[in-house]
Amino acid sequence: MLGHSIRRFTTSVVRRSHYEEGPGKNLPFSVENKWTLLVKMCLFFGSAFSVPFLIVRHQLLKQ
C-alpha cells in the first residue's frame, strides 16, 4: 500500500516538472554563439593538451 502511494507521488511529480527542451538546452554551457563556444573549447582542450609538455619543461629546467 505504501509502495503504491510512493510510486504514484513520484510519477505525478515527474509529470508536473517541465524543463526546456531542444538541442543544447541540457548542457551546462551555451551553444548559441559558435565563436565563444570555439574559444571555450580551445582553452579547455588546449590546456589539457599542454599540461604534459609544461610538466616536462618544468622538470628539465629544474635540474
UniProtKB/Swiss-Prot annotation:
Spell out which residues are annotated as carrying N6-acetyllysine: K25
Question: What residues does the transit peptide encompass?
Answer: 1-16
Topology in the lipid bilayer: Single-pass membrane protein
> Can you list the disulfide-bonded cysteine pairs?
none
Matches recorded under InterPro entries = COX7C/Cox8, COX7C/Cox8_sf
An example Gene Ontology cellular component term from the record? respiratory chain complex IV
Family per record: Belongs to the cytochrome c oxidase VIIc family.
Name of the protein in question: Cytochrome c oxidase subunit 7C, mitochondrial
What is the source species? Macaca fascicularis
